[in-house]
Regions:
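Non-catalytic signal-transmission and effector/linker regions of two-component phosphorelay proteins
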Residues: 1-11, 76, 113-143
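Acidic, metal-coordinating helix/loop segments flanking the phosphotransfer/catalytic sites
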Residues: 11, 36-54, 62, 76
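Two-component/phosphorelay signaling modules centered on CheY-like receiver
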Residues: 17-35
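Short amphipathic alpha-helix used as the core "switch/output" element in two-component signaling
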Residues: 45, 68-80
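Negatively charged, flexible loop motifs adjacent to catalytic sites
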Residues: 89-93
């Protein structure tokens, strides 16, 4: 399988089993490879050994850590990892903190088309950024 035809890998973190299953099913139907993580601890374990094209993470994980901490950990392991924070809480402090960290927020209940559109946009941006970096590297080599 070439790099262009490989499935995008998405890590989905949510502590509610039904929500995690729903996201997984929707994304797999659209052709994505999904790795579900039911806790911040499991997400960290998975991130220790795998790389992903996108991270979808619930804000409230029912633990000591929030989705912000999971995303920060992931970006420490994989700088530049596109991330979407999902939350049912509407508040300026959440939006401001996310914006400051370069994290997009989707508010629950999530509209499926908005959900899929945000995922496509983040993956497309990541691919464009990678292609641009490769082009710059080749240009510098030929000088």
């Amino acid at each position: 399988m070439t790099a262009r035809t490989r499935k995008h890998r998405i890590l989905v973190v949510d502590d509610e089993p039904s929500v995690l299953t729903t996201y997984r099913m929707i994304l797999e139907q659209k052709g994505y490879e999904v790795v579900p993580a039911p806790s911040a601890q499991e997400a960290r374990r998975v991130l220790e050994g795998d790389s992903f094209d996108l991270l979808l993470c619930d804000l409230s994980l029912g633990e000591k850590e929030s989705g912000f901490e999971v995303i920060e950990f992931a970006r420490g392991r994989q700088p530049g990892l596109p991330s979407l924070l999902l939350t049912g809480y509407v508040g300026k402090n959440i939006s401001d903190r996310a914006q400051g960290l370069g994290i997009s927020v989707l508010f629950k209940p999530v509209d499926i088309q908005e959900f899929l559109g945000a995922i496509r946009a983040h993956l497309s941006f990541r691919e464009q950024k990678a292609a641009s970096s490769q082009w710059i590297a080749r240009s510098e080599e030929s000088e």
